[in-house]
Amino acid sequence: DIVFADKIILYEGDTERMLIKSVLQSAEFESLRNQYVSFVQVGGAYGYNYRSIIDFLRIKSVIITDLDYDKDVLTESEILSSCSTNSTINQFAASIISDPCPTVQTLYEWKQRSNPIVINETICLAFQGREDGFARTLEEAMLAKRYGITAVEKKNQNVWKKHRKEDGLKFVIPRDGESDIHSIVSHTARAKTDFMYSVILSNLAEAMLPNYIKE
């Protein structure tokens, strides 16, 4: 499938696939839709393994993966000083910027310099940036974009319930106190496909498309 493709999109999970295939139906991506695109699902630890064959075939590709920093951090400063646990990101960082364990701050700066990160004119490495609201996953980036907040800004239950009802989205709101997007997504972990279905059925896929994927 890869050998005969015009382009390759490598992604992590079902929610990425659902979102990408939905937004590709829009007029903005007509030229890409009219090409033969190979969709390859790879876990965050395995995307780097495709580098050699992509370089050999010289097919323009994008690896869409998650920043995956420490999920227990509570502030923006803690996020910036934490490290990604994503093996694909770390292996590319070791190869390209000589840093096998980059902090989030280092990764943000790498993205800003490269805008976007392109390796050997064939592979675009796409993961959440600062403009995605300090998100560590796809779902966090989508909610951050929709509601114009960062992943660590807290809102009370009534605000989240209002957002959920008005947009027709399916996500779990923690019962106790105020919650941030980290907590919302963590509590929705077992229903991520339901969340993505609700985004698509509410015609919000384009509006919630994160910057790191759109670029």
Q: Where are the predicted features?
A:
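Acidic, Mg2+-coordinating catalytic modules of nucleic-acid enzymes
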Residues: D1-L10, D14-E215
